[in-house]
Amino acid sequence: MKRDILDAKFFDTRIREENIGGKERVLGYFLGPVSVVFLNSILNNYLNVYYTDVVQLGHVWNGWFLTVFPIVVKVLDALTFLLMGIIVDRFYSRQGVARPWILFSAPLLALSFILLFFFPSGNRGLMLIWIFVSYNLFYSIAYTAYNTCHTLLVPLSTRNREQRGKLSVLTNTQGMFSGMLVAVMFPTFVIPAIGISRRNWIVLMAALAAVMLPCVLLEYFYTRERVTEESRKRGEQHIDNVENAGLDHCAEEGKINVGQNAASHKRSMKEQLRLCLQSRSWTVLMIYLVLSQLTGLLASFGTFYYCNWVLGSYNDGYTQALYYAVGNAPLGLGLFLCRPVCKKFGRQNAMAGGFLLAAAGTAVCVWNPQNIKVVLAGQVLKSIGLIPSTYMVSAMLGDALDDVEEKTGVRCDGFSSSVYNIVFTLTTGVAMCILNLGLTQLGYVAPEMDDIPLQNEAVRGFFTFCTVGLPTILYPLIAVVLWMETKRVKTGKKAKQK
């Protein structure tokens, strides 16, 4: 993408206000990205179902294709996230460092999403190659470019913590809203209607991709990078930072873009990692993300199978919808409860206590995993506990980036966004690998058009463990990690006061 093209006024943000207003929140931070979140929610919940039940790839290479494929492509995806982080750290234009890549990714997202479902079926070897290429086109290129920069929009939108906290709640509402929509509509109406017909799946996904494209453009045109603009105006201060870091010649020659963090512009990934690790907040955030994402993703991937083979019957049209609609209903109240609760108890205290409550809820589900009333009660309890963590991740990232800058004098935004997304990417691959390993090795039988099989006890127990068992084990561990950081912060504040 040429920088002179981006200098045209047509590509300027439509947001002129210095403070974040309603138009920016609604169009830029909700309606814009919600389409991508919605489609990604579909992929997280149903792409593996498409592979196992529609295309029936479960027995390819004796089941090892679906076991190895997720982790291989996610490793490649992680590498491209690192590359994208380097690009963002070294890129600057009139439109900012992140927004231009959202514009670039919009058409690629739509095209590659369709190709995930539309592939030749006559030649198995060609089909597997197509799946590999299309998956990497979507995740390693289009989604990587989009999500690296989408992740940065809230931290770069403003330095005002209150406004950033409100944006964090709003942006994380997308995940809840999209997840609920997919969880209720798909098992109730969509999946029973399209069945296991490949043609029906392809037509539906193409229509959804067409709707997504203009929404991504809304996100580009109705957001603004105020922190980037501020950095540009403080160019002289950045040059002083360069000189203090021993890079006087670069400052004198004016080789560093004014809009970039001059001290981080030429730093290697290893050096930026060293700087980030000096921030305890940054380190705790990454540990938290690994544990919470692995737990949440494995539960999410296993939910379809758990609801169809343990809690209810295959595509009965209501079990999975009830599981999500009733079980996750408290998350809707979180839009109004999250900020008051976090303000009263402290963000990390609220999150830590919430995870313990969530663990109690999943323990109720484990106690009687086939009783829908018991499971729904447990899910309601779990959802109440997860309210703080559901809405506060973006704010945690923004605070961690500010803490890195405070500790080191350097902003490592692009690098941190890459690591943030690498955690999401690799935990997705690991979770999918674990799920598919269980499917293929424990004897999962895919349904046919007119034949709904019975699954053995080992398979059913595995689905229960993925969906409600593992969270019962890991949620308390996550709470301990958050509480240790809270205790450290309080100790640090007392030491400063002395």
Region spans (language model):
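Membrane-embedded alpha-helical bundles of multi-pass transporters/translocases
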Residues: 2-246, 254-498
